[in-house]
């Protein structure tokens, strides 16, 4: 795989080390987002961060997390590239900017829809011992089906012991414990979500300062202007559970999703946001994180260490081919009758693909061989 396999479109964003573009994959003519990082410009630690993002993203599968498709090193451009799901709806930061220009506020229903999806994506990460560490409006994307996606896992870590120490994140969304340079846990992400929820209501962050030092002091104090009366007390209560200076008293993602307020909102929201994408998402699935990707001495060898590509269309084609092969192997009479244009369909007896896959993967084909 190389850059030549894609047609480059609009530039979505550019930083000091790389860029994100809309690309069209020639093989399936579908649009994706490609993050390209110039390896030559990165320090050793930054290279490992890029590989860590690939490692984590490729291990995840949830409707509220940006989907991974493939990663490759392009020898011509010397760039490490991650091909991801393209969210046509932009990000929450763009939505806020649009509302500021139009002098509009989001409806409360929209905000509840969004915050529930953010929390469900975050629960999936936390259940798998992953801290995002850079949750902000600009890192939350919206699909064409209006499904929210947590993205940019460059700073995410697997916290096996439940704590982290590295001071990182975006200042407006950093928790008091990070500002104090103290060890922090998953509750630090909750603070960030509280800042996001507040910003969706007020169209500005809860804490702002004339300088970085001033901002830090305000965050540590934890005092913010109340949310306007246009919104309900329920929103104010949920924000107050998140923006608690003491992380031990701050709500966890499970406590929030199981609160009476959100249980009621979730039951109403589900009626509106259920799509095929959500239905197939494995929300409670425990992920098998791939092993740490080690940086080889020769960068040309890095492609051998990267995870396999994952495109839905190709996976479905593989499944269909696999299904036909298994069906012909187990039940040749079905194939013969179908070849003879017999209209009789035996698939219902064996529950189609599920039955066949269940037995072939358990090794029962040896019995019949």
Region roles according to the model:
Residues 189:
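Conserved catalytic-loop aspartate of Hanks-type protein kinases
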Residues 31, 36-60:
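Conserved N-lobe beta3->alphaC-helix segment of eukaryotic protein kinase catalytic domains
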Residues 19:
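Conserved N-lobe ATP-binding subsite of Hanks-type protein kinase domains
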Residues 114-115:
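Activation segment signature within eukaryotic-like protein kinase domains
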Residues 77-91, 95:
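Conserved short submotifs of the Hanks-type protein kinase catalytic core
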Residues 70-72:
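A short, aromatic-enriched beta-strand patch in the conserved N-lobe beta-sheet
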């Amino acid at each position: 795989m190389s850059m030549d396999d894609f047609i480059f479109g609009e530039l979505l964003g550019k930083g000091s080390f790389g860029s994100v573009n809309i690309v069209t994959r020639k093989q399936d003519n579908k649009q994706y987002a490609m993050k390209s990082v110039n390896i030559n410009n990165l320090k050793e630690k930054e290279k490992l961060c890029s590989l860590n993002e690939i490692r984590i993203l490729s291990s995840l599968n949830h409707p509220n997390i940006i989907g991974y498709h493939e990663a490759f090193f392009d020898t011509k451009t010397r760039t490490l590239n991650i091909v991801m799901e393209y969210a046509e709806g932009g990000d929450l930061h763009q939505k806020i900017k649009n509302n500021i220009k139009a002098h509009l506020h989001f409806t409360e229903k929209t905000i509840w829809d969004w915050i529930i999806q953010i929390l469900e994506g975050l629960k999936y990460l936390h259940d798998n011992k992953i801290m995002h560490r850079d949750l902000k409006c600009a890192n939350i994307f919206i699909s064409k089906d209006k499904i929210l996606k947590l993205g940019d896992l460059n700073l995410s870590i697997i916290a096996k012991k439940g704590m982290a120490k590295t001071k990182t994140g975006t200042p407006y969304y950093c928790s008091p414990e990070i500002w104090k340079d103290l060890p922090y846990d998953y509750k630090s992400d909750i603070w960030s979500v509280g800042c996001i929820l507040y910003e969706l209501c007020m169209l500005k962050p809860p804490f702002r300062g004339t300088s970085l030092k001033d901002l830090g002091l305000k965050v540590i104090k934890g005092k913010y202007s109340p949310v306007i009366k246009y919104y309900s007390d329920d929103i104010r209560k949920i924000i107050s559970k998140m923006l608690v200076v003491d992380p031990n008293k701050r709500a966890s993602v499970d406590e929030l999703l199981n609160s009476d307020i959100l249980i009621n909102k979730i039951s109403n929201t589900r009626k509106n946001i259920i799509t095929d994408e959500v239905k197939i998402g494995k929300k409670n699935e425990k992920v098998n994180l791939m092993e740490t990707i080690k940086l080889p001495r020769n960068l040309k060898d890095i492609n051998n260490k990267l995870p396999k590509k994952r495109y839905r269309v190709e996976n479905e084609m593989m499944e269909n081919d696999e299904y036909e092969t298994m069906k012909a192997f187990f039940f040749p009479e079905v194939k013969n009758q179908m070849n003879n244009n017999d209209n009789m369909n035996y698939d219902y007896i064996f529950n189609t693909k599920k039955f066949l896959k269940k037995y072939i993967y358990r090794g029962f084909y040896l019995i019949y061989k």
